[in-house]
Amino acid sequence: MDAVDSVVDPLREFAKDSVRLVKRCHKPDRKEFTKVAARTAIGFVVMGFVGFFVKLIFIPINNIIVGSG
């Protein structure tokens, strides 16, 4: 019975914590949602530009290294 309790007790505790978390969460209103969506979009754009410029810098460097061999 002790082996069963060692498996069931963590699952029961996880379920209890999950229910507590869901009860505390709230649905964002339109203003909060648009703010989060805008910041996420800005993050995607910034990361895209960073990736583009890194690629733009390393393509000529790679051609110099590979082209010299």
Curated annotation (Swiss-Prot):
The principal localisation class reads endoplasmic reticulum
Q: Does the keyword Transferase apply?
A: no
Q: Which GO terms describe its molecular function?
A: protein transmembrane transporter activity
The cellular component terms of Gene Ontology attached to this UniProt record, alphabetical and capped at eight, are: Ssh1 translocon complex
- The record places the following residue ranges in the Extracellular compartment, namely 62-69
Mind listing the GO biological process terms from this record?
post-translational protein targeting to membrane, translocation
Topology of the protein relative to the lipid bilayer: Single-pass membrane protein
Q: What is this protein called?
A: Protein transport protein Sec61 subunit gamma
Record organism: Oryza sativa subsp. japonica (Rice)
Q: What is the lineage of its organism?
A: Eukaryota, Viridiplantae, Streptophyta, Embryophyta, Tracheophyta
